[in-house]
Amino acid sequence: MAAEVPTFKLVLVGDGGTGKTTFVKRHLTGEFEKKYIATIGVEVHPLAFYTNFGEIKFDVWDTAGQEKFGGLRDGYYINAQCGIIMFDVTSRITYKNVPNWHRDLVRVCENIPIVLCGNKVDVKERKVKAKTITFHRKKNLQYYDISAKSNYNFEKPFLWLARKLAGNPQLDFVASPALAPPEVQVDEQLMQQYQQEMERATALPLPDEDDADL
C-alpha cells in the first residue's frame, strides 16, 4: 500500500487583483486536479512537490474572487496549517491592506507559518519598494518578491513553508513541478538589484512609526 502523502491546508489571501489565482494556476497538476467547494465558494488546488524526504502536498485554498465583496468567512481559514498573503508591488493599497489579511488569518489560525509575497515584480513600474516592505519583519513572516506570470520564485514560498512544517531546514525540492510556460520574462539584472535592495533594507532598523513611509 502506498504511504500517505503529508498534505497541508494552505490559505492564499490578499486583495482582489493581486494575482493569487494566476499564481496557483501555474502549477499544472494542481490546476488539473482542483476541486470547487460550492458551500464556501473556494477552489482547492492540490499542489504536489517532491522533496529529498518524499512527496509533500499543499491543498491551496483560493478564494475565487470573494474578497472583492468584503472579508472572508471563518470557514475559509479553519484548520489552515500555513498561509500565503499576496500583494501587488505595482499597487500601494494592496500592501497597505496586508495587516488586515494577516489579522484575519491569525485570529483563526494562531501560530501557523506565513509567507508574504509581493507579486508582479516583472512590471517595470514598481510602486512598493524594498524599504517600504517591513510588515513581515514585525510579524516574523518570510518575504519573497515573485512574478506569477514568469514563474519567478514560484517554488520559494512553498519550500520555506515545507521546511517549517516538516521542522527540517535540510528539506529540499528534488524535482521541479510542471509549470505553465512563462507569459512574460523577468529582467534578471533587475531581479538581482531588487534582491540586493531587500537585503540592505532588512539590515536597517525597523521604523518606529507604523508604515510611515506608505
From Swiss-Prot:
Family per record: Belongs to the small GTPase superfamily. Ran family.
Record PANTHER family: GTP-BINDING NUCLEAR PROTEIN RAN, RAN GTPASE
Organism: Eremothecium gossypii (strain ATCC 10895 / CBS 109.51 / FGSC 9923 / NRRL Y-1056) (Yeast)
Superkingdom of this protein's organism: Eukaryota
Binding of GTP, residues: 15-22, 65, 119-122, 147-149
Subcellular location: Nucleus
Region (Switch-I): 34-42
Keyword S-adenosyl-L-methionine in record: no
Listed PROSITE patterns: RAN
Location of the region described as Switch-II in the Swiss-Prot/TrEMBL record: 65-81
Small GTPase Ran-type domain span: 4-168
CDD domains the record matches: Ran
Predominant cellular place of this UniProt entry's protein: nucleus
Protein name, UniProt field: GTP-binding nuclear protein GSP1/Ran
Example GO molecular function: GTP binding
Biological classification of the source: Eukaryota, Fungi, Dikarya, Ascomycota, Saccharomycotina
InterPro entries (UniProt xref): P-loop_NTPase, Ran_GTPase, Small_GTP-bd, Small_GTPase
Keyword Lipoprotein among UniProt keywords: no
GO cellular component, one term: nucleus
